[in-house]
Structure formats: C-alpha cells, structure tokens
Amino acid sequence: MAGRKNFGFMVVWFVLLIGIVTAIPASGPSPKNTRQTASIPAADGIFKGRHNGALEYHRTLSKYNIPIPSGLQRVVNRYLEKVPSDQTGTVPAVPQDGDLEWISPANIGTPAQQLYLDFDTGSADTWVFSNDTVTKSVKGQTIFDLSKSTTAQLIPNCSWSILYGDFSSSSGIVYKDTFALGDLVIEGMTIESAKQVSTQFSSQKEMSGLVGLAFSSIIQTEPVQKSLIDFLPDVLPDPIFTTDLRHNSSEGSYNFGYIDHDLYDDEIEYVGVDVSDGFWSVKMKGFAAKDGSDFSYEFEQPAQVILDTGSTLFYAPDQAVSAYYKNHVPYANFSYSEYGWIIPCNSTPPNFIWELTDKDDNVIQGEVPGEYFPYAVLDNKGSPEGYCYSGLQSLGDFTSLQGILGDIFLKPMFEVWDIGQQRVGFAPKPLPPMKTAGKRRDLMANKTKKVILQ
C-alpha cells in the first residue's frame, strides 16, 4: 500500500512539474520580437502626373518649412491652373515618367493591412491615410482601417501636426500598432493617423502615407513619441538600413539589418553624420565637373547638407550650382519664368563629382551622371523650345540650409545608413549600360586648379 501511495505521489509530482515547465516561457524573445532582416522593393514611375520641376522645388521648400519665393509661387499657380483639382496633371518628361519618389509596401495592424508608403529619411513621422481621415482628403488612396486592427491602441491626449512652408498642413491623432516590413515585425510602433492631409499628399492616390527614417528629435507628435529609428536597433541584427534606388527603374530596394554585397562594387566608404538637428546631415567639401577641365571647387567652410530619400531633386549649395552651370554647361541659364535652372533637353551635362566630409575630416567622393539632369520638358507658353528643367537646383538665399541631396543625388550610388554609429556609407554600383562600376579612384586627380567658394 505504501508503495502504491509513493508511486501515486510521484505521478502527481511529475504531472505538476510538467505543467510548471510548460508554463515557463522559453528563453529568448518571442518569434515576433526575434531580430530579423527585411528587403523591401522600391517601386518608381507611378506618379505619372508630377513631373514638373517647379512643383518639385515648391514641394521640397514646403517640406522643410522654407518660405516660398513669390516668383516660384507664381510659376506653380500657373501650372496648377491647367490641372484638374483631383489630379496633378500630365507633363512630358525626359527620359520617361518616373523617379519622382519611391514607394514600398508595409503591413500595419492585426490582421495585417498592406499600404504603399514613401520611405523618407527627411522626416521622422510615420503617418497614414486612415478611416480617421476626412473624406475630402481621400482621393483614391488605400486607407488603414483602424477599426479592423485588434492591436491598434489609441495614445490618449497625443496628436501630431506638420505645417509646411506653403502654410498647408497635415495633422491627426496617434496610435500604437504592429508594423511590419517583410519578416521584420515591430509591436507597439508609433503610427500617426491623419485626420487632415495637405493637398500635396492627397493628390497622390498611389501613396498612402510616409515612413519616417530621420531621428525622433524632429518627430511632430505632442507629446514626443518614439520614431521608427528608435525601434530598429532592438529588432535588427545590425542597426542599419541600405538604399539602392535605380534611375528609371523599379528594381531598387530598401534593405534593413544587413548589407547585400551583390548590390555594389568596390568598398563602402563612410562619413559621419550630424544628427543634432534630427536629420542625416553631412558636409559637402567641394565639387568638380567631369569635363576635362583643370578646375575643382572647394568651399571655404564645408556646407551643411541633408541626405533625403523623400526629395526628388538634387539641391546643391548655391555657389556650387552657379559655378557648375556657368563654367561647364553651355546654354544653361536660370529662368525666372520657370524659377529654376534650365538646360537643353538634348544635352548631356558633365558628371557632377562631389566630395563629402565630416568633423573628423574623413573625405569620400562620388559622382552624379549628367544624363540624370534633364528632368522635365518645359511646356509653358513662352518657354524656350527644347529646354528642360534641370534636376540640379539650389535652395537660393531663402534659408540657412545649404543643400538637400535628394534622389537624383542618391540614385547612382549604394548607401548604408548606420544608425548605431551615426554615419552613412557610399559605394559605386553598376549603372546601365555598364555591368560593373569599376574600382573607386580619386575623381579629382586631374584637377590642378582649385577655386575657393565663399
């Protein structure tokens, strides 16, 4: 009898032990929080109506809350008068419609709802069109239906608002919800739900919002919430993301947590970024034109510029742009009727060779093919025939910001955005029709005469 009792006790004890063991969570994070990588396609060429240089210039100034010059506003108003209110119009482009900006898929909520969003290193806010958005602002966009997400949680007394330089604005309320890029899943991500949307976004039906990849010091929530950059180091094996944007192609990608060595040639060279203003800011040391001339140009004080995947054009410091066009691009001129630099559409300006530096005096070089610069055919009455708005512009004297290096600057290179070490890396990559980019060399080696830009 005693033996039976002891055996029964052992059975009960064993069953209880199994129950205790199975109730203890397995060591390590749950699958949704496991560190993952993601490769997200970057689609271009879908914003068929927005190929207007002055409109892109206006849009960039507005984004950075830079006052809009009256001359530029007149040009944009003239353009918009020809465009139906529910679209952005169709303007002939050279060489084809595309390269306005790259949108990529993201999944939000539970169950997941897929939206195509603009991945933007010039903003810290991740916001979406949703069922909170006023009806008049939704013009064909896919919206995020918060009522269908079981994981959406409203953050009490939290709102967001962005005022643009043209005095338009976007605003709304803030939630936490599950946010996924491929296999990369972030729980409790800050999702800004739009109530009001600026017309510059509501007119783009293919894009359902933005993914902000700048630093949280510039996030526009009140009170301040974590931005995507704050979440990434906790969910990535390596706190980096890379960009491979392609000229007139939808084969580009954003990769998170790893470097795909098949996407570039030679070595990645890094320069430190200044994140004190919340942006990916670097310093432009100088430039040269790849045209056989002996001249290179260097700033007396390196110019602070911002790397921005969310801006279409390449805005270099004013002195550099003027010197490049006046000394190296025949028939280029600044047109007040277009409010920008214009060039013959059938021309191929010389490649723009650039140098970036940082506080530790690291210097890296790269070049933008001149064939990227004929951006949009001028179609206004009185515009010179055969001329195009150039993809290389300056911000002028309207701001202390000296440059915004947008997609035209970024497309020829492969970039690594290193969150942990606060640096950005560049490597050459094959550009059509070439199959290889070749080895990096000193691009200014034959420039024997230096001009100092003040």
Regions found by a protein language model. Give the residues of each.
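Aspartyl protease active-site motif detector
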Residues: 102-148, 152, 179, 210-214, ...
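Disordered propeptide/prodomain
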Residues: 3-115, 140, 168, 270-271, ...
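Extracellular/luminal ectodomains of secreted and membrane glycoproteins with large N-terminal domains
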Residues: 117-118, 256, 287, 292, ...
